Amino acid sequence: GDFAAGAAVVNEFCQEREYTSTHLGREFLAKEPTDDNYVSASDCCRLLSDIYNGTLVNEKADSDMLELLKGQTVKTKIPVGVPDGVKTANKTGELSDAKLGVVENDIAIVLDATHPYVIAVLSNGVKSNSEAQNTIAKISKDVYEFMASQK
């Protein structure tokens, strides 16, 4: 496919919906990038909220996206921090590259029956994947406990 055309569509979509801290500027691991990719935790949380509330595209498309997120097989970060039986719909991102370093990210809709919420934990330049995953799980646990106390 044509990366530039696809990136333009993604960036326009983000701008139209005021995800102003998100930009797709280069192919993943491009050898000589002329631009960069970035996203904020705030934009990620808004995106997940819009999907959960059915207000991102339309009810059917948003429901389909939610089902895809529920099917995530990497459950080593945010899902570790919530009690057994609490479902999550999450999207992870990870990178371990000699030049770019270690990145571990996870964003999720925590589908708790009494207090569903969204959470995004993004990292950059951490020492190891396992250390970052453990930290994300700890943050997730702390957030879950806080949200549960707000009933």
PLM region descriptions:
Residues D2-A4, L47-T76, G81-V86, K91, ...:
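Structured C-terminal helix/loop/strand segments within mature extracytoplasmic catalytic/sensor domains
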Residues G1-L56:
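Mid-domain, small-residue-enriched loop/turn segments at the edges of structured enzyme/sensor domains
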